[in-house]
Design a protein with these regions (language model features):
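An alpha-helical support segment within catalytic cores of ATP-dependent transferases
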Residues: 3-19, 120-175, 180, 185-187, ...
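ATP-binding pocket architecture of kinase catalytic cores
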Residues: 26-129, 149, 167
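Active-site acidic catalytic loop and adjacent metal/ATP-binding pocket
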Residues: 32-38, 45-46, 159-206
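Activation segment
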Residues: 51, 95, 191, 199-201, ...
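Glycine-rich, phosphate-binding/catalytic loops in enzymes
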Residues: 62-63, 106, 209-211, 268
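Active-site activation/catalytic loop segments of kinase-like enzymes and analogous catalytic loops
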Residues: 205-232, 244-263, 272-280
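Start-of-helix signal in alpha-solenoid helical-repeat scaffolds, especially tetratricopeptide repeats
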Residues: 237, 241-244
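Amphipathic alpha-helical coiled-coil segments
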Residues: 277-290
Length: 291
């Protein structure tokens, strides 16, 4: 049974139907299998996590996050989460994925969603960014990888940046606020924020930095819209710091995925992905000192 046949069978079982059909696979992410499925005239998404996804996501925490964020009306309705396997069935949102648009033209809509999240009383756990990075580095070492000297030096520099921004107030954050996780409804007036598995208490600029996955210029543009003025040196440094951190995190995730065989399984060179993110992290760290 291939993954599409499996998903059809699971949706039929969960929805007590026999007419589930695959509509399409959704792109995005580095290894998950997420499909749009239709049954009884209604569309859903079904997610099957990729190999070793459990290393990076606590599914019980994801379920708790979903229950919390439902109060804001920003996410799609989740019908089912299997906390052991990480499989998830949710209602499909008709609209346009932000990454497929002129992203900056929707900054006002995006800022409104961010400020709704950041000013809320949602109760999330501490995101614990550097604890996560420590874990990611350890996973790589356990697979026989030795971080090169250039990485160690950059990590030390990142630790120094962290100390400089230690007093920032933590607020509820999505922590994966990249345009592929945002959907604009068909009227163009409402933004849905999807995939809350990484949500936690964090610096609100961390969410803005996530826009860098679509190009760091997008994060800079969103920052200006968020603060409603030309960003100060301190504000820019916070953004550069968080994006540098994210790039090092992606570096380790990509190295791990290559070491467990996902480069071959998914026909994606994760070593090249790792190099891309490391080079970006180094560039951001170098520019940080000039701000």
């Amino acid at each position: 049974m291939n993954v599409e046949e499996y998903i059809v069978a699971r949706v039929n079982a969960l929805m007590h139907t026999e007419d589930a059909v695959i509509v399409k696979r959704l792109e995005g992410g580095m290894s998950n299998y997420t499909y749009v499925v239709e049954t009884r005239g209604k569309r859903y998404t079904y997610r099957v996590p990729g190999k070793y996804a459990e290393k990076f996501v606590d599914r019980v925490e994801e379920w708790d996050n979903i229950q919390e964020v439902n109060r804001l009306g920003l996410n799609n309705a989740t019908s089912y989460v299997e906390v052991i396997s990480g499989e998830k069935l949710a209602e499909y949102v008709e609209g346009t994925i932000m990454s497929e648009t002129d992203i900056e033209s929707y900054n006002e809509l995006s800022v409104a969603a961010l400020k709704c999240i950041h000013s809320s009383d949602l109760r999330f756990k501490d995101y614990n960014a550097f604890g996560r990075l420590d874990d990611d580095e350890r996973y790589c070492r356990e697979m026989g990888f030795t971080h090169p000297k250039a990485y160690v030096e950059l990590r030390h520099k990142l630790d120094a940046m962290r100390a400089a921004h230690a007093d920032v107030k933590m607020v509820p954050c999505h922590c994966d606020y990249q345009p592929t996780n945002l959907v604009i409804d068909e009227k163009g007036t409402k933004l849905y924020v999807l995939d809350w598995e990484f949500a936690g208490m964090n610096d609100p600029f961390y969410d803005i930095a996530c826009y860098g996955n679509a190009g760091f210029d997008k994060a800079l543009s969103l920052l200006k819209a968020y603060v409603c003025h030309e960003p100060t040196s301190e504000e820019l440094k916070r953004l550069y710091f968080h994006r540098c951190f994210q790039c090092l995190q992606w570096f380790n995730v990509a190295i791990f995925k290559d070491r467990v065989g996902l480069s071959k399984d998914l026909n994606m060179d994760f070593n090249n992905v790792a190099t891309f993110f490391f080079d970006m992290a180094k560039d951001l760290a170098d520019k940080y000192d000039t701000l």
